[in-house]
A protein has these predicted regions:
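An alpha-helical support segment within catalytic cores of ATP-dependent transferases
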Residues: 2-13, 121-174, 184, 271, ...
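Conserved N-terminal boundary motif of the eukaryotic protein kinase catalytic domain
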Residues: 13-21
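ATP-binding pocket architecture of kinase catalytic cores
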Residues: 20-128, 149-150
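Active-site acidic catalytic loop and adjacent metal/ATP-binding pocket
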Residues: 30-33, 159-204
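Short, glycine/acidic-enriched loop or turn micro-motifs at the edges of active sites
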Residues: 46, 89, 176-178, 196, ...
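Conserved strand-to-helix beginnings and helix N-cap segments that scaffold or border functional pockets
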Residues: 52-56, 203, 222
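Glycine-rich, phosphate-binding/catalytic loops in enzymes
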Residues: 59, 101-102, 190, 207-209, ...
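Active-site activation/catalytic loop segments of kinase-like enzymes and analogous catalytic loops
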Residues: 206-237, 250-268
């Protein structure tokens, strides 16, 4: 069905092609158009997907940095949105660590830090959203009936460490990390999947990289996160507090909990587990916080 729809809307302009489904860093239905020159990627989503509208606005804003694929065209059908974008070379960053290529992973984490500081967080909020979400921390609702009361109470206490100030906001990716990048042999980094991007404090992205690494790769987390933060601070000398970083991680987990409030019970239970883990775990127990 998808191939039929895509050929109907794309064949006349881009020529004949076959579809190759892409995984590793791409979400939704994402395909390589095999046979086009130059190679193209299309992302296919439900027409009423607000996350995709947010992503498109973000990609248009950040296009000149070179850290994202270029958008060539947006096609809307009765039921779908089809985004035609540039194909970028590279392998999924997470697969490098999964294959135990530790030295290359170290270089990747340095690149993650430098790119985040120089090419993403360098875009400051100027009190105009440009169609990109704005952080809602100051109006955040912790009332979800499937979350245990003691976790709500603990979260409220931790979130008091945050003093959210729009003057500190920058463009944030929202789910930044090795799982959402492509990385080449020449150390070129492409950042994918900007659906969760928002204007927010830069600590949301910094904390989330460390959170993801500690959750999934605890044996490597401290050394890799230290490399990431060192490189970030070389390019953006920012004050980092373990307490505030953890608070922003709790905020991020709550944002996901709101996204899964209609999801199956096992999905909700997994994110409740992650909230408890975030509250109890010393994620930022390495040096270089000042």
């Amino acid at each position: 069905m998808t191939e039929k729809v895509l050929k109907k809307h794309l064949k006349e302009k881009y020529g004949d092609f076959s579809l190759v489904r892409l995984t590793g860093g791409y979400t939704n239905d994402t395909f390589l158009l095999n046979g086009t020159l130059p190679p193209l990627v299309v992302k296919v989503t439900n027409k009423f997907n607000e996350d995709i509208e947010n992503e498109i606005n973000c990609l248009n804003l950040i296009q000149e940095t070179g850290v994202t694929p270029k958008i060539y065209e947006l096609i809307e059908t009765d039921a779908l949105q089809i985004i035609v974008m540039e194909y970028r070379k590279g392998i999924n960053g997470q697969s490098i660590l999964d294959n135990n290529e530790l030295e290359r992973t170290k270089e990747l984490y340095k690149n993650l830090g430098a790119s985040l500081a120089k090419r993403i967080h360098s875009i400051k909020y100027n009190y105009t959203s440009s169609g990109i979400r704005e952080c809602t921390f100051n109006e955040f609702n912790l009332s979800l009936d499937f979350v245990p009361e003691f976790l709500i109470a603990n979260s409220m206490e931790i979130l008091q460490n945050i003093n959210d100030n729009k003057e500190e906001w920058v463009l944030t990716h929202g789910d930044y990390g090795i799982h959402n990048v492509l990385y080449t042999d020449t150390n070129t980094l492409t950042v994918l999947d900007w659906e969760w991007s928002e204007w927010a404090n830069p600590l949301t992205d910094i904390g989330w990289v460390c959170w993801f690494t500690k959750l999934h790769y605890p044996e490597y987390a401290d050394s890799l996160n230290l490399l990431f933060i060192k490189e970030y601070k070389i390019n953006n000398p920012i004050h980092l507090s373990p307490e505030v970083l953890r608070s922003y991680c709790v905020y991020k987990v709550w944002k996901v909990l709101h996204k899964v409030k209609k999801a199956p019970q096992e999905v909700q239970e997994e994110w409740i587990r992650r909230l408890k883990w975030t509250i109890e775990t010393d994620i930022f127990n390495f040096v270089l916080m000042n």
